[in-house]
Amino acid sequence: MKLEMALSIALALAVVSWTQEFFPKEAQTLNWSKFSGFWYIIAIATDTQGFLPARDKRKLGASVVKVHKTGQLRVVIAFSRPRGCQSREVTLKKDRKRPVFRNTLKGVKGFHVLSTDYTYGLVYLRLGRGGSNYKSLLLFNRQNISSFLSLREFLDTCHILQLTKQATILPKDDSCAHTILP
């Protein structure tokens, strides 16, 4: 029993340590002007129950990211939900110490670009209010199709975040995504 507990603690510490090394500590090098614009959401992994509709009703998501003011982003996200296509807009403020944007009043605990080459983006989104916390990993792409390498990175990151079972590649139907075209 004690050995199992010790092994569990050691494994948890190793995962936390490796996760901190995997994720960039600073996004200062990210060019937000280049990252800004329209993105298709090609894939999602989330621990939010009931977020996506039934498989036959799923569609590509979309996001528009804009630099609002210095240290602020305006983000619009559209998704096919159980009640149809829905979009939300929120203004996020950059954290002073961490490379993450947030708006806790609107339930956004973190919007963090984990990696990008400006044709794709891997975005870690943390939501929550009260005692509820949810994490999502989004694969952004400028086109409605993804490269093998960005999809592989998405799936590897899902594994690290323990979201592999929830990973979903969205079908190419972009009718919901086009509702927020700038």
UniProtKB/Swiss-Prot annotation:
Question: Which cysteines are disulphide-bonded?
Answer: C85-C176
Give me the Gene Ontology terms describing cellular component: extracellular region
The leader peptide range reads: 1-19
Q: Name one GO biological process term.
A: response to X-ray
Provide the GO MF annotations for this entry.
small molecule binding
Please give the tissue specificity annotation from the record for this chain: Expressed in epididymis.
- Provide the alphabetized UniProt keywords: Acetylation, Disulfide bond, Glycoprotein, Secreted, Signal, Transport
Instruction: Specify the domain of life of the species encoding this protein.
Output: Eukaryota
Q: Carries keyword Nucleotide-binding?
A: no
Pfam families associated with the record = Lipocalin
Q: N6-acetyllysine is carried by which residues?
A: K165
- CDD domains reported in the protein's UniProt record: lipocalin_10-like (cd19425)
Subcellular compartments: Secreted
Q: Which InterPro entries match?
A: Calycin (IPR012674), Lipocalin (IPR002345), Lipocalin_CS (IPR022272), Lipocln_cytosolic_FA-bd_dom (IPR000566)
Q: Which PANTHER family did the record assign?
A: EPIDIDYMAL-SPECIFIC LIPOCALIN-10, LIPOCALIN
Q: What does this protein do?
A: May play a role in male fertility. May act as a retinoid carrier protein within the epididymis.
Family of this protein: Belongs to the calycin superfamily. Lipocalin family.
Q: What is this protein called?
A: Epididymal-specific lipocalin-10
